[in-house]
Swiss-Prot record:
NCBIfam families: recR. Belongs to the RecR family. GO terms for biological process: DNA recombination; DNA repair. It comes from the Bacteria. Keywords: DNA damage, DNA recombination, DNA repair, Metal-binding, Zinc, Zinc-finger. May play a role in DNA repair. It seems to be involved in an RecBC-independent recombinational process of DNA repair. It may act with RecF and RecO. SMART domains: TOPRIM (SM00493). This is Recombination protein RecR. A zinc finger (C4-type) spans 56-71.
Length: 197
């Protein structure tokens, strides 16, 4: 039997992605065991994040400044805008180091089943940004799911009147992927996105 404080810690940890009740219990135990070296610094870091981290008013990224460091970076290409589902998508793009433009975070995907419509996403602010003559290309980097592709098509339609090129990420065979390990949809997408050598 554990005390109410530890039980609450376990319950909160189990709400994190990838942590079920067992993993949360192990994590809580480790935190309590390493109180001075782990629990106290983690609690301070979480308090600091709760107090200082905010959503960028331009792109939707999380940062301690507004606009965020990406939007404020004058070395980034102002002509390219990458549209992502959420901040996790933005961080994934940044991790590659291959995109040097700016971002627009939608805050989700269209989903009739979940009751998420266009008004629930950052589409209006994206369309307003697309009217900036400095922006010449918008890359739709939504997931290769039904909801992701539905959202991409809707956004592309909304951007059609704007004077920008709208492109999407290629889908298909991952680097190091073998054909016999891929599903039919991935192989079909790879065939459609083929390129000339």
């Amino acid at each position: 039997m554990v005390g109410p404080e530890i039980e609450r810690l376990i319950q909160l940890l189990s709400r994190l992605p990838g942590l079920g009740p067992r993993s949360a219990r192990r994590a809580a135990l480790r935190l309590v065991e390493k109180r001075e070296s782990l629990l106290v610094p983690l609690a301070q870091a979480m308090a600091d994040a709760a107090a200082r981290v905010r959503t960028c008013s331009v792109c939707g990224n999380f940062d301690t400044i507004d606009p965020c460091a990406i939007c404020a970076d004058h070395r980034r290409d102002p002509s390219m805008l990458c549209v992502v589902e959420d901040v996790a998508g933005l961080w994934a793009m940044e991790r590659t180091g291959s995109f040097k433009g700016r971002y627009a975070v939608l805050g989700g995907l269209l989903s009739a089943l979940d009751g998420v419509g266009p008004e629930d996403l950052g589409i209006e602010s994206l369309v307003a940004r697309a009217l900036d003559p400095a922006i010449t290309e918008i890359i739709l980097a939504t997931p290769a799911t039904v909801e992701g592709q539905t959202t991409a098509h809707y956004v592309a339609e909304r951007l059609a009147p704007c004077n920008v090129t709208v492109s999407g990420l290629a889908h298909g065979v991952p680097v190091g992927g073998e054909l016999d390990h891929l599903d039919d949809g991935t192989i079909t997408a790879a065939l459609r996105a083929r390129r000339v050598f």
